[in-house]
Swiss-Prot record:
Protein name: tRNA (guanine-N(7)-)-methyltransferase
Listed EC numbers: 2.1.1.33
GO molecular function, one term: tRNA (guanine(46)-N7)-methyltransferase activity
Record keyword Endoplasmic reticulum present: no
The gene coding this protein: trmB
UniProt entry keywords in alphabetical sequence: Methyltransferase, S-adenosyl-L-methionine, Transferase, tRNA processing
Amino acid sequence: MITIDRRVQTKCSVLGRHKQVFIDMNETVHHQGSFFGRRKGHKLRAHQADLVDNLLPHLALDIELPAPDALAELFDAPVEAVRLEIGFGGGEHLIAEALAHPEIGFIGAEPYVNGMAKILARIEDQNIRNVRLFAGDAAELMAWLPARALKRIDLIHPDPWPKRRHWKRRFVQDSMIGAMARALIDGGEFRFVSDIDSYNAWTLAHLLRAPEFDWTAERADDWRKPWSGYTMTRYGRKAEREGRRASYLRFRRIAA
């Protein structure tokens, strides 16, 4: 058994529903290349391909250019703040948030072209104007973002990469926690949702040892139940049908 900080061990065991889930915090996992695997799945339908070819260029961020001093400049209409969702999948959560909060600008990062095609169709159908997209590696986007630029970062049901040799592909790494701390405003939040206990434990262990973040949970229901206004994704509904319960973790950026 690996010995880790008592505070980390206790809370990880809680998230594991009293199963002992131990994470070796002495093992350093370095980021080498992309956090993602394959980038293309099923062949796109004709209209989907047309959206990728013609609508995406108008919404896509070009990180070859310098980032604006204020991310609000990326949006046609004035926005009060900017949020980021990493790996939005089919876009259910991101679209619901964009519609519910027209005063907020949203950036969605997704490397898979099929997911990008799905969200483009929703953006076109509902004439959504407060979303910009990045079709690439979120690590590169994080490096491009200006400091203190984001109000919130969401990571909803990410690929858990369960095999040990693939852990370096998980988004939650010390390097990315540092990048999020740089990009978030003081009091901003990183929100994480997963139905995989080992990835919840991994995330909690990493964030608890990060001096820039504070776990906001005060009672079990704070992580057992979705936060107010949360939109369940297609994957989340599938997990529930199969008997897997998600955890909903929220971490606040501590003022520097």
